[in-house]
Amino acid sequence: MTRLIQHRANNLESLKGITSNFGAEIDLRLHYGRLILAHEPLVDGCEFVTWLYEYEGSLLVVNVKEMGLEDLIVNQIISVNPQLDYFFLDQSTPYLIRSIVKGYRCAARISEYETVDSAFSQNTTWLWVDSFTGDWTHLIELSQRLDKEHRRKKICLVSPELQGRTLKESNEVLLLLNQIKELQLEFDAVCTKFSPIWEKLLV
């Protein structure tokens, strides 16, 4: 089953409709010593622990907006919902390596500008597969690498609208899904702003 990840679910209002079959992507940073959800700096937001108690999703994508918060984040996740599946995204290299050594779940990025070789060298649990321009040819190399190494990686696909392209008026997603089918790639999650559209596409 492919789980749909709601992009920037940074407040309690955004949790409506997120059930056990769904997930959320959030931004975490410190604000006067409190761990809060906020994409931009110097603004207040919902405290992470408060948000966690309301969260009913089965997967959490954590975009760490300040370096070195991983221990605090994991401790709060364990204290509220130790069974919650999660992974860190967009970490700087030193903190990514540190997190992997500690056994934390992390993602490596793959796109036109971030190579498959680099992603596999990082030994992460998840791959965050993106396209900034609409060019998805890196999926071919990803498929070949997975076949060659017989390694099962969890994969999250980034929906085109997260990079500013229009989802509703474009056939990019249909072409993308056809390419995924031809390559026999298996995606575990899709991060999107428009879960209802993807629900129909994945039927």
Show the residue positions of the predicted features:
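Phosphate-group recognition and catalysis centered on beta-loop-alpha active-site segments
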Residues: 1-203
